[in-house]
Amino acid sequence: MEPKRKSGSLAKHDLPQFYLLIMLYLAQGIPVGLAFGTVPFLLKSLAKETSFTSLGIFSMATYPYSLKIIWSPIVDSLYNKRIGRRRSWIIPVQFVSGFVLWALGWCISQGIIFDGVDDAFHNRGNGTLHSVSIKNLTWWFGLLVFLCATQDIAVDGWALTILSKESLSYASTAQTIGLNIGYFMSFTIFLSLNSSDFANKYFRNIPLDHGFISLGGYMKFSGMLYIVITIYIIFCTKEKPYVEYLPKVEPINTSDGGSKPISIEYDDGDVVSTQNTSSIKYIYRCFIKVLKLKSVRSLAFIHMISKFAFQCNEAATNLKLLEQGFKREDLAVTVLIDLPFEIIFGYYVVKWSSDKDPMIRDNRRLRNSTGTNKVIKFLVGDAGVLTPWLWGFLGRLAAAVLGSYVVKQFPKDGEISTGYFCLVIFQHLLGSFMNTVQFIGISAFHTRVADPVLGGTYMTLLNTLSNFGGTWPRLIIMSMINYFTVYQCTIPGTNKVYVTHGGSMQACTELLNGTVTILRDGYYITNLICIVVGLFLYFGYLKRKILHLQSLPISSWRCT
């Protein structure tokens, strides 16, 4: 008899598909890292007078990633049967994405877009920005994120069928590993290798004015990587490696143009029912049914409000450190340290999120046998599938509190001590790790409750709500920081002093050649508001509702 596989472990026959998903999510993480991290970083570090409102406007480039549900049913229903439902979209979208990345990289290298960011690499200047058009940057990177979001719809749907049922929970692990590696490549690793200070300090005997990799060069390399991955998908993959149809049955047409259900059998013996998923009308009708489910509406509301509590910390803390003089290559190192932790512990968070895993049962017994039961129950309630999400929420709140302390304690003389550097590392490690705990926990829950019949549409709906919950507050948060901040502008050679409430530093430094002094920093006020709102939301609503949702049967999430 074949030895029984351990509960919760990845099946060996699913390893090729698992690695393929990692590569697809890695490719997706490249433009995400550029739009969400690198470009705002470069804008703030190369032009410190860039206002937080301008950064908030650029954040609109990330909106397609949060609005992809609008065209998700189209991606789910229109496809070439010979190529496959998911490959029909992944292949052309990745080809176009690769071309756009390469073309955008070429334009940046030539100074046509993002003028000045690569000047030091081409002997055109010292690397300072030249009147960058935030509007143009937003449009170009918005296009890139739109393509990335479309690819994400297809990959999320593919993850539901490319893995066997026994390994389905590892789709969220592949997503976490791939997205993190791609994000770190485009954000942390790129910023380190792009920095002249980093290269001169650690690798060069003779200092130069530029780092190892330019932004344009990196984007052209990323475009070629997209093409290589796409060629592999064309020639080396199948749409359904472990899914076989039962004996062929001709669909029976119904009055509404659809078809009666057909059974699909997976290799692991699970049988699900499907209909004519090539009908856009059918997919949209099912989509509306899903939105009407009480459980989905409750989860949607949670997604829309839960991330407000951390937005100031995660969007502005690193930028405030840059503004005060923290070197971007040092900040990149703090982010780099986090990568192995997220990959290693991601596996255990998946097991933690499985209600079939012994870890949860052991956790329940531990609560009943220790004196910490009351404290734990007060904080996260009874153990369940979403317990990691609850702990992650509290951990990110703690990281937000620590973020204000880290910015406040920045050395007045600008000299970074080892102790302070370790404090920055710890704060970032806490925040990003707890973010990963929440992400894997909720992704595993999404995979568990999503209806395989709807494939990418259902997963995209849940993931879109989660993403948009972290996107919509960002412009508001950035505007709040600007509004609550009071600047003093001193004009040299005169006795004139202007006090601006919620104004722009750029007007003072560029138009008046003045010196800016911050009298009141709106970052602290905004972060405090977010934390207080988060505490009220968690103990007043979120914890209670999450405990209810995780106890619902799978039938509460299905419309087919």
UniProtKB/Swiss-Prot annotation:
Membrane topology: Multi-pass membrane protein
Entry superkingdom: Eukaryota
An annotated Gene Ontology molecular function: acetyl-CoA transmembrane transporter activity
Transmembrane segments: 18-38, 55-75, 89-109, 140-160, 173-193, 215-235, 330-350, 375-395, 422-442, 522-542
Family annotation (InterPro entries): AcetylCoA_trans_1-like, AmpG_permease/AT-1, MFS_trans_sf
Keywords tagged on the record: Membrane, Transmembrane, Transmembrane helix, Transport
SUPFAM superfamilies: MFS general substrate transporter (SSF103473)
Record topology, Extracellular segments: 39-54, 110-139, 194-214, 351-374, 443-521
GO cellular component: membrane
UniProt GO BP: acetyl-CoA transmembrane transport
Topological domain ranges for the Cytoplasmic compartment: 1-17, 76-88, 161-172, 236-329, 396-421, 543-560
Protein name: Uncharacterized membrane protein YBR220C
UniProt source species: Saccharomyces cerevisiae (strain ATCC 204508 / S288c)
Lineage: Eukaryota, Fungi, Dikarya, Ascomycota, Saccharomycotina
